[in-house]
UniProtKB/Swiss-Prot annotation:
NADP(+) binds at residues 45-69. PROSITE patterns: ADH_SHORT (PS00061). It holds the Pfam family adh_short_C2. Its EC number is 1.-.-.-. The active site is at 190 (proton acceptor). The lineage of its organism: Bacteria, Bacillati, Bacillota, Bacilli, Bacillales. Belongs to the short-chain dehydrogenases/reductases (SDR) family. Residues 1-25 are annotated as: Disordered. GO terms for molecular function: oxidoreductase activity, acting on CH-OH group of donors. Substrate binds at residue 177. This is Uncharacterized oxidoreductase YhxC. Keywords: Oxidoreductase. It comes from Bacillus subtilis (strain 168).
Amino acid sequence: MANQKKKTLPPQHQNQQPGFEYLMDPRPVFDKPKKAKKLEGKTAIITGGDSGIGRAVSVLFAKEGANVVIVYLNEHQDAEETKQYVEKEGVKCLLIAGDVGDEAFCNDVVGQASQVFPSIDILVNNAAEQHVQPSIEKITSHQLIRTFQTNIFSMFYLTKAVLPHLKKGSSIINTASITAYKGNKTLIDYSATKGAIVTFTRSLSQSLVQQGIRVNAVAPGPIWTPLIPASFAAKDVEVFGSDVPMERPGQPVEVAPSYLYLASDDSTYVTGQTIHVNGGTIVNG
């Protein structure tokens, strides 16, 4: 049948967000062997760093010489596994579990990180949640508030908390999404938060440019992370990513280099921008 979607993954579903990487089939690809020490001696705070894109970024940053603070909700097994990969690179890794939608917790994250490490140089605001609903009428007030707290309020909280520790040359990187540009009829609230993240990135970059702090975003397309089986029905997971020009989902390891570019001195003339890693979809944004 002409309109039948290409199967890209085994059907599967998880009943808890943001999902568990160790339960996924196949496991997401998050590691490559090459390293150049572009982040030697720096420290990065990465929310959602236990799995998915956050794990790939954590491991890549470690390969490049950065100490890593991984902030995650409650996926302890994934977090411990990621910590092992990070520390295998000869750097330090601090795990902090909690809800980034809570401002007090975000303040505590920065407090703990500043006690363990001599500097904080990079903030990766990556944690997110999404809940599929067939229409706006099905989005409860609780879901709406929760999605905004996790996806965008957390970025305000952590940025405010970490800003006194950042110095010239520091970098803030926010995870947006292709949904900020294309929309998604079953992820209305999630897409709205991602649109807010793009504007937050642009506005904050203008606010901090005179301090020498760069602010950018990465807008992934369909990437194989635990959030996918934790969000979508098994039949939808089976064809996940088949609707982009490359006809497959991306792997976290294919997104992580964008974060490294924005965190390193390779991008010293880049701020307020969004990098699109989406399998070929043209968004002109």
